[in-house]
């Protein structure tokens, strides 16, 4: 299951997200609904430029999505199952891991830093997955975990959160994190995101855009 709600999302369509089983089993409903309702910022009686000119405002897509892990979409049998599910229900999108909180990109990335440090695993073929989903009208949202990264923070300890003693800080699960104050960590994430867009992902969802909040004594 999804470990926590998404921290940031590039776009905010009206979205209903039903979480899937991260072990690759059939999806389970979590009844988590996220509806975009941004404030207009207008004072009472004011009208928007579209209303004044008569231009129609573009409607945001209504997305009803399930979350699928990289391992799940790496299975042809499971892809077929979820395509059939989308074709026979109101589901019209899937959230698929680009980089999970295990720190690995789920496919062979061409991003130089990923190649240099080997921070990827062959969980699935993104081109095959995207081709099959898009052929069935399925919108694909790529989930990209940002600072909870126990792999790149070990490969690049200079970019990791440090303890007061100068070593690598670890959360209560013994995992190291990237330091949000280090600009190189932003660039690393953006490069992976740009590659995913070029591959054909329709949207990027950034997760864990923060320090760890579950452990006490962050800098101990």
Model-derived regions: residue spans:
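Active-site-adjacent "subsite" loops/lids of carbohydrate-active enzymes
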Residues: 58-67, 71-73, 147-195
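Aromatic- and acidic-residue-enriched segments that line the glycan-binding/catalytic groove
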Residues: 107-117, 149-171, 212-220
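Catalytic domains of carbohydrate-active enzymes, especially glycoside hydrolases
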Residues: 80-103, 199-203
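Active-site-proximal loop/turn and secondary-structure-junction residues that shape catalytic pockets
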Residues: 72, 100-102, 146-148, 208-212
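Polysaccharide-binding and catalytic clefts of secreted carbohydrate-active enzymes
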Residues: 127, 171-220
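N-terminal, intrinsically disordered, polar/charged segments of Gram-positive cell-envelope systems
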Residues: 2-61
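Glycine-rich, aromatic-flanked loop segments that form ligand/cofactor-binding clefts
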Residues: 93-95, 125-169, 205
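Aromatic-lined substrate-binding rim segments of carbohydrate-active enzymes
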Residues: 102-144, 220
């Amino acid at each position: 299951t999804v470990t926590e709600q998404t921290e940031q999302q590039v776009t905010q369509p009206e979205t209903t997200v039903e979480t899937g089983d991260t072990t690759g089993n059939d999806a389970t409903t979590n009844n988590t609904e996220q509806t975009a309702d941004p404030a207009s910022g207008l004072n009472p009686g004011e009208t928007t430029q579209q209303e004044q000119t008569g231009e129609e405002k573009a409607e945001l897509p209504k997305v009803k999505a399930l979350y699928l892990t990289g391992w799940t979409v790496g299975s042809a049998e499971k892809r077929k199952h979820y395509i059939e599910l989308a074709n026979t229900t109101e589901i019209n999108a899937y959230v698929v891991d680009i980089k999970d909180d295990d720190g690995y990109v789920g496919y062979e990335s061409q991003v130089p830093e990923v190649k240099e440090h080997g921070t990827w695993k062959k969980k699935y073929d993104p081109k095959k997955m995207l081709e099959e989903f898009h052929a069935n009208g399925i919108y694909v949202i790529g989930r990209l975990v940002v600072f909870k990264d126990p792999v790149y923070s070990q490969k690049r300890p200079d970019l990791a959160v440090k303890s007061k003693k100068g070593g690598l800080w670890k959360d209560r699960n013994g995992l190291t994190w990237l330091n949000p104050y280090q600009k190189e960590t932003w660039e690393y994430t953006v490069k992976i995101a740009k590659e995913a867009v070029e591959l054909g992902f329709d949207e990027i969802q950034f997760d864990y855009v923060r320090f760890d909040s579950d452990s006490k004594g962050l800098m101990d």
